Amino acid sequence: MRCLISYLFHSFLIFLKFIRSDVTALTLQEKRKKSRLTGILMKSMANKKNHQQKKSTDGSTMNGNNATATAAATTQNSSQIGQNSNSSHSVTNDNTSSNNASTSTSSITSTTTTTTTVPSSQQSQSQNQYSHQRLSSTSSTSQQTGISKFPAKKAGHNELEKTSNTANSQSGAFKGTTNKDRPKEKEKNTHSGNRQSQVNHNHHHSNHVSGNQQNRKNKNRDHSNQSYRGGYTHNHNNYHSLENAKSSGFLSNSSLSSAGQISASSAPPVSTTPTAIPIFQESKIVQTDPPVEEAKKKKEKPKIKRDEEPMPYKSTDPKNMDSVMAFKEHDEWDKVEFMCELVSFLSPTDLRLLGNCIEGSVRCYNNQMRPVEKTSNCSDPTAGLPQFVCSPPPPPQQVYYFPGIADAALYQTRNAVNSVFVQQHPPGLPPLLGGMQNIMYPPDANFHHSTSCTTPSSSVSVANKDVNNVPVVLSSSVNGISNNIPSDRQQLDSKPNTARGSSGNINQSNTTSPEPEPGSNHISTTAANPAHPTSVTVPQSVPPVPQEPELFLKSVLDLTSYIYTLMAVCSSTNRKSAAKISDYVQNVILREKSQILERIPDELDKITVLQEIGKIVAAMTHHPAITLDDKMKYAALRDGLRAQIETLFRQYYTTQKQLEQSNLVVPSSQAVGDENDTDSDHESEEEFEPLSGVMGSRFESNPVQPSPSVPGTFFIIRFIGRQIEKNDNLFSLEIHWSDGDRTFAQRSRDQLKALQHRLLDEFGQQRSEKYLHQGCTTSYSSFDDDNKKLSASTSTMETFAPNGERIVPRLARDATPAQYVQYINELSDLPARMMLSAVICEEFNGTRAKTEDLLQETREASDGLIYSRWKNPRAKSPVRYFKRNATGSIDPIELPVNMQPFLYSNIPQTQVQTLFPSCSNCGGPHAPKHCEKQTLLSKKGDHRTRSDGEGSQQNGGTSSSNSYAPIHANLPHAVYIENPQAMLGSNHFNHHQQQHIIQNTIFHNGGQFRANGTYEPQIPIAYYHAQGTVQNSNNTGGVNGNSGGGNQNSNF
């Protein structure tokens, strides 16, 4: 035991000797290394002085900031050497030395690195992040020395290499270092401000190449301070660092930055030479302003981005808006279109939810909408509406008015028309909002009147029939006629009359003022013209009050709004009422649309009327009670209405309209929507503008209608072939056009073969080829085999590619129906020049023909050429139309068509006889809307929302809901019967009858709400007795035999 203790004691002593010798060797080696480094430092300082003198001599080639920076660095390094030489053997702590470089005792190695262009704090901070931290520091404490595993000689050798590299980079290659490494130093400087507390002075690397590589890899690691400092400066003309100008609030380790600028340091004063103070001040003054300005600009960029963040509902772009807000931006017509179109995208569950929401919202309007709903679903909903809005045109001899002639006849005509209107009232018409007690539409005796001077409105209420007398009607009608006299026209061109006639309409077009009573119209007319009496025989030469066109506009808007309401509340199964409303819209509103627009002077008011008509058309298009034929007509009418609205907008914003508004309304300012300044030519002719503006507004009353014969900018983009059932010889073609139109045609086998032969005769030699060019495959066609060139739409270079398949698809002589359908579909792959050729145009452009275009062709002489289709694309060969008369027989009607010479005419097409469809309800030779037989939907009952209040008593015996089948037909005794005798055998069948009655009342009470709880019938239950039961085969006494023997369920 003693031997073991003595052995351990001797081994411990040996270990202490070994450690002491190791520490002594390291201390000596460190002293030698420090002495060597001091000598190298003195040499590098001498080289720097020589370089500074050289830079001062040739200042034109070097930057002045570099000289001052070098001098400042030299003086600072000399002061640091004197300070650190006294404390070279002290112990260093990383955490304390990172905050203040002058107060902490650092090693000579860290002092040497201050001579480089990179500060020691920045370079050591960048080196701690890199992966090549293999070398340990030689200036560590005694604790770190014991842990280090590197030999002292190797560490000293590496340190010497680092120091020599630093000195060489400072002395030998100073120019290249300053020019190449300064942009990279700026990137290093931007990272060092936030992480000064993490710097390790004992682990560093002085090599510039490795430092730059490290900084390049860790460049994007921490940019938390970039928004504060303004980001990287990519200006290589100025190498000033912006770190110290934009301090981040942390203390700096070095008192001098790499750019020659004093950093904000809290170090105690160091004894330096007096020459260093002006150098420091000069280095501050040398700092130029552009980097600071750039830093300010870059610093302001994030603030601008924060200020420009899009606010909610700030822009009117629908993509940036809420869907509800975007919906509210549209006009009334588009809102109706969106509502009806979006319903088709809903699922059945969503539709039920929407129906419940609508039912809950409409419930409060039941009493208000009940009379309109009753009128809309009656047998004749349009009985009380006027048969025409504007009167038919007068005979030609009444164009000019002569006093004392035809007054009596004109008065009688007007009186008769007004009496017809006054006696007709819509049944259940609710009072319209806006002051109009009744809808009256003035007949116009003068068809060729001006737009600014219109005939007055005869919309007189029923209560004021006595006001609707001769002076009111004839005074205004005389004005409408007398306005066509040229002498009166000259009087209208005066300033007061034009300002009263035109500017009043413009100012009052958008704002609807409360209208006075019809009696006040007569008073205002006589008050405005006191010199002219209001008798029958004396005409008035002054224009009428401009309020009367507004009365006409108001009455038209009320009529269109009422028709839209009628169509909206019409039941979805009431096809008869919907057909009559549709007929009224087609025969009255749409037929007199141009005359209505003529009587409205302002373009904006015309657009408002057209949008109201568009709402009606949209409701007709989507309403389920409208027939498919009418829906197709209304769908085709929508494009024309939108084109007319666009034309009116263009007319409103034309230069002539702007000049007219600027001269008539506000002479000193431009009109609404005026974008261009007034030219000198317009200013020189300013005195003639009011005359031309008023005259132009009269004679240009008709808006430009889109001509049906538009030049041919359309072509076929797709063919879809289908085989007609039970007929292998006929095929139907669905043709899609580039303008969005879709037509249908029917061709037989022989007609398709003839089309194939014509295509082969025209384009049989053209081939489809493949050309490979740099890995890109493109297809093109050649015109013939000898000269293979590309088409003009692609290129004109020659090619020697091999022959490919021909462009025209192949069709075998004995092709099957499936191959014919495939051939029709392959025609869609023909190039555009073939689609626009005469073969395709003459074959399929006739499918775009419409009846109104054919009637227009009869009035217009055709030039007889093949390409006359381009002038009138929907023209086609002569057609025979067939129509059924009242007896059901076919009455063919041949329309006169210009027969062209056969050589220049279109190819005759096979006409399919189209008969008017028979009634789908009774099979009679009439339209379904004229059928008098009750339909199946009418028998089932309507599906409209009930307008009765909740909890109202319903008579179960007379309710139409009893026609429905019960939900639970075989529900066994769900409700108890008060009469116990009903459960006996003789009354068992009566009991089940009573069960069905109760179930119908519970589950089918018209959809009315019923509170939870026991059912209490409102009507006394009628019990059926034995005489109404079914006789049983085993029953001999006339009583139900269930009580006796036999099968108990024989009656069921």
From Swiss-Prot:
Residues 892-1052 are annotated as: gld-3 binding. Residues 1-25 form the signal peptide. GO terms for cellular component: cytoplasm; P granule. It comes from the Eukaryota. Residues 163-172, 480-514 have a biased composition (Polar residues). Isoform C interacts (via C-terminus) with gld-3 isoform A (via C-terminus) in an RNA-independent manner. Isoform C interacts with gld-4. This is Germline survival defective-1. The lineage of its organism: Eukaryota, Metazoa, Ecdysozoa, Nematoda, Chromadorea.
